[in-house]
């Protein structure tokens, strides 16, 4: 493998819908040379062509992990491959992707326990690329998180402040922009009126995410899971088609931002 052009380094961070609960066998194949995963935990001396499940084995005890109770992985298929494929298709910009996600995590937990691990993964990727004379054009974060804050009835103001505080740590590590993927619904189709009431908590977070991107130029609302209620496989997660469509939409917006 030889990379001769400058790359864009992207951290894919958040909770379970960033880690992905789809079906890898249904995900698209990435275009040859379009993107590579830097596995900061499990394979820090190499770049691996992007494929699903993205982030496999990128689990750190006492840090970002996505294990099942018996030690298997919860990562089963994400938005990343579709995103990178579209991003590369637009202008031919190669992506180096870094996994930094953990299911069921709130912004408060991220501030206390996980942002340091995520930033360390970004720093490791930067060092690897520098050591291998691979130039970096831009550093971005794709952030998909918020369901747990909705469950906890976090207010819009606190959610926006926590998210800004977290992304400031990425900014200090060199990130130039955050592309936010808005959360979807609590799947009230499975839970009737109680589910609709619970989904109002998620609407608070969706509104906070819209406001944050409107008010702060460091953030762009790049895609949303909100339209994909009928593609939900359980109370919180989606079939692969939804991850692919959200990833494609996000990749397109990201490249338009660069234009």
Predicted regions and their residues:
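Cell-envelope and extracellular/periplasmic
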Residues: 1-259
């Amino acid at each position: 493998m030889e990379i001769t052009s400058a790359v864009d380094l992207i951290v894919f961070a958040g909770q379970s819908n960033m880690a992905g609960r789809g079906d890898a066998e249904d995900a698209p194949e990435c275009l040859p040379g379009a993107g590579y995963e830097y596995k900061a935990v499990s394979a820090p001396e190499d770049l691996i062509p992007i494929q699903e499940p993205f982030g496999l084995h990128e689990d750190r005890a006492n840090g970002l992990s996505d294990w099942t109770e018996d030690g298997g992985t919860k990562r089963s298929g994400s938005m990343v491959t579709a995103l990178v494929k579209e991003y590369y298709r637009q202008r031919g910009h190669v992506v180096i992707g870094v996994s930094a996600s953990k299911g069921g995590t709130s912004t408060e937990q991220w501030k206390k326990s996980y942002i340091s691990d995520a930033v360390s993964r970004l720093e490791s990727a930067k060092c690897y690329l520098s050591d291998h004379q691979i130039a970096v054009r831009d550093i971005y974060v794709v952030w998909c998180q918020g369901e747990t804050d909705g469950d906890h009835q976090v207010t819009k103001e606190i959610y926006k402040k926590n998210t800004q505080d977290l992304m400031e740590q990425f900014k200090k590590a060199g990130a130039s922009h955050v592309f936010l993927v808005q959360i979807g619904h609590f799947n009230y189709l499975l839970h009737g009126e109680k589910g609709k009431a619970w989904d109002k908590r998620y609407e608070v977070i969706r509104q906070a995410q819209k406001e944050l991107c409107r008010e702060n130029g460091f953030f762009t609302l790049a895609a949303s899971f909100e339209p994909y209620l009928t593609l939900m496989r359980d109370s919180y997660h989606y079939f692969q088609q939804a991850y692919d469509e959200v990833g494609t939409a996000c990749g397109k917006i990201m490249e338009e931002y660069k234009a």
